[in-house]
Amino acid sequence: MSNKTLPYCCEHGLKDEVIALLAKGEDVNQKDGSNRYPLHYAAIGGYIEIVAMLLERGALVNCSTPRGATPLHYASRGGRIECIQLLIDNKADVNCRDGAGSTPLHTALQCNETKCAIALIETFGADVNLKTAEGSTALHLASARGLVPVIVALLENGARADVRDSKENSPFQSLPINLTENEKKEKIENSISQDISKLFNINKNREFSGVGKKEDDDNNMKIDKQESEQQSTSDKLYSDITFLIENQKVYAHKCILQARCPNFMSSINNKIEQQQSQKPIEIKDYSFKLFLSFIEWIYTGSIEKFESTSKSIDLSFQFSILLMGEKFDCKGLVSYCREFIKESIGDSNVGSIWSIIKKLPTSTRSNLGNLVRDCLITMVRSWNIFTMTKTFSTDINKSDIIEIIKSLAPFITETPISEIKQTRTANANASNSNQSKTPAKRTSTTNTNNNIPQQNITSSNNTPQQNTSSSSSSSTTSSTPSKSSSSTPSKSTSTSSSSSSSSSSSSSSSSNYSDSMNEKNLTFCKGLINGMFKKKTSLAFQRPVDPLAEGIPDYFDVIKHPMDLGTIKGKLDNNGYSTIKDFAADVRLMFENALTYNADSSPVWKHAKTLLNAFDQKFLQNFPNEKPPTYKPPPPTPTPIPTQQQQQQSTSSTSTPTSEKKRKHDEHVKVKEDTNSAQPTSSSSNHTNGENASSSSSSSSSKQSNNNNNNNNNNNSNSTTNSSSSSSSTTTTQKKYSDEERRSLMERINELAPDDVQEVLNIIDPNAIKQADESLEIDMYQIDDKNLSQVESFINECFKKQKQDE
């Protein structure tokens, strides 16, 4: 127990150990190596008794991590409502913000802690309209995750539905609404043929006599004759009912009206009985245009005025016809109007449609089927536009918005945390690539050769090291899959010819592929993911990260947009990607999260680097125009100013990451010094042979020589920097590089960051870059002096920037 610190005991809920440590006078505000306080661990774990003990001993209730997260953030992340209550009772700030501008309410929503979020809103009085650094309110976050109960609670407590985030999106723009195929289409009921067949069935149920047949034949002959002579008079002669609306007559037939709309005939039967004469039946409830359209549908199954209109017009007339059909229980007419209105709903008229719908009686609205649903879905999906309309400002209130969300609740799917991610656009990738230093391009003759080798180099230098020995060359063994290596110009001495041929084939294939997620691309992407699942190194990426179960409570402090292979596979299976770019962005996001959160020396970091490199290489081979982005190391974590004691404790530890980083960078490229290369003079040749032997042995030596090499690297770096600066300022001829200077440059290359190593390899003549097995080798003696001068200039610039950053 003596070896257990207070933060450790609080993290694991060791109540008795905490009591013992507090009895010994342990400082309740001591931080661990991650700069988190004991109260953080107790809060996220839900150990309320430990929280109470710490607060009673004077724990800082609003203490924060380097990223600004307080114990209240941690309790909200874990859904620990009791701990939240206790912290707020002890004056915790319910609206405190972390480094990303997130309040505890935002944090609870980011972790899908629905009950906790509702408690913060309704019980603890959290401000529902505060924004994160990305401009998202709690309503944005709840909507993106499909958390209907939280959305309703937010709206009831004053959340604004028209506020926009930094991307100019209103909250409901990202509301996940999913409809099945059966819900998307609704069959129109009671076709004309069905209705007319009912009329014919009446004749089938009676015995036909010859007289009846003759009468029928005579009628048919009369109708045919009359239609041929004068169609206009046929309506009057053979119609048996006439309506008078606004002093205009409409002719009809009782049998057809009875078959098509029985309830309408029932409503006028009294008038027919009272009016034995042939006087027209007066209709006062409807306009002539409306009633004529009603009769038109009864006879033709369509309304000409409907067919000639567009989405932009006022649909009040169509609603009037629909209500008329609903009143007389004419299901076919209701279905016809409903489908027409559904197809006519657009961004410009959805507000006016909703204004009409919400005024309808509840019984009528229930008979509108999917029309109400489709109207609400269109309204929500065009929320950015709708919030700027006059209808929104004049006719929509808080209760309306709540009703909208409740009505859509059955179709809103709660989105898993792992699927919530930041949209990463091509502009962001372009911005990242522009920020990296780009050396002067070579002439067109070398650009051709540079095409394919550059692809190999990129993946090599972004590959994590899975060392099976101390040799740096073995570290890149897993960088290039065996299948893909056969298609690249590896193991070839004639690099130029193989590269140029590959370049031409690449350019021809690039014009034959589409970036849309068609069946061919979907099959390829599924193959990539299934291949990753089979690798043992992918176990850590196959499911979403559980911070509590895995003992990493700060995971969501660092990683705001989680992603995993299981989620990606699910989206592929459900056609969740529209383009290959979206798919690749998710895969890279998953591995970049691992590289950001984990230490360079950890197995997870190395596995992530290996898998990311393999993915980029295979993806690039299949989609030559989809260049992988330039991966930048994450920015350093901001830390508070340490005390004198902390500075003394950290003195010894700060040197370790530096040396580890150097060793890591040394493993990125295996540099080969060719002992058989021709040298300018015999003396230099002898000297080279000796030096090459030592260099060759050092490249495969054990880790015991790393410290000496690093010291030599520093000395050589200084001398080379001085010589290069004096040379550039005093000489006009090309500098000649000695063997020692070439080795010095080689050592300095290995000290660079991975991205800088990539740029160096882009500068070097591709003929000097060779691939042996699955590792890269640079022959320093095949690089001419002019090319070396470019390399040295870039290296000096990199070290200068590193010193400025320090």
UniProtKB/Swiss-Prot annotation:
Residue stretches making up the Bromo domain: 516-622
Low complexity: compositionally biased ranges: 426-436, 443-511, 642-658, 694-733
Protein origin, superkingdom: Eukaryota
Record's compositionally biased regions (Pro residues): 626-641
Ranges of residues in domain NET: 727-806
Composition bias, Basic and acidic residues: 210-228, 666-675
GO BP term, pick one: regulation of DNA-templated transcription
Keyword Transcription tagged: no
BTB domain boundaries: 239-307
Region annotation (Disordered) ranges: 210-231, 423-517, 621-743
Protein name, entry field: Ankyrin repeat, bromo and BTB domain-containing protein DDB_G0293800
Keywords carried by this UniProt record: ANK repeat, Bromodomain, Repeat
GO molecular function, one term: lysine-acetylated histone binding
InterPro entries given in the database record: Ankyrin_rpt, Ankyrin_rpt-contain_sf, Bromodomain, Bromodomain-like_sf, Bromodomain_CS, BTB/POZ_dom, NET_dom, NET_sf
Positions annotated as ANK repeat: 1-30, 34-63, 67-96, 100-130, 134-163
Signal peptide extent: none
Bias type Polar residues, positions: 676-693
PROSITE patterns: ANK_REP_REGION (PS50297), ANK_REPEAT (PS50088), BROMODOMAIN_1 (PS00633), BROMODOMAIN_2 (PS50014), BTB (PS50097), NET (PS51525)
Entry's Gene Ontology cellular component terms: chromatin; nucleus
